Amino acid sequence: NDAEAICEAVARPNMRFVPVKTGEQQAVLSVHRARQGFVKARTAQANQIRGLLAEFGIVIPKGIGHIAKRLPEILEDGENALPGMMRQLVRELGEHLKVVDQQVKEMERQIKLWHRDSEPSRKLEAIGGIGPITASAYVASVGDAKSFKPSLSRHSTHG
């Protein structure tokens, strides 16, 4: 049973234990998860706007920036095929997209603030190709990397 297995595991001399995350680490990881959810919602909203406009023959390239740039001109263009109801819908969806985009930016602001105050996270960022988002997520998930003695044990923890 489970209790027996736990007792056996504790008694083994070569058993390694994963350190418990601090409240701060859990909070940073929660902000990362929230950011990821907002990014997913933003992408879904952008794709919905693109898809609805495509049904009226209006094509917007991929990228949030393209939508932000093109939406005002599309809504003001009285010669396109958009009925009034559709214009209002697209306007509201565009406003919702702006709100979700602001939520993503706020999560990124919080992550960057934490990153700025975290020496291990800043050290990771010094490695080429690693930015504040990746560095802070890694430091928050791993914590003290010294608890992993050989590099192979760290690798097996993170796939």
Predicted regions and their residues:
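A detector of single, family-specific signature residues
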Residues: 1-159
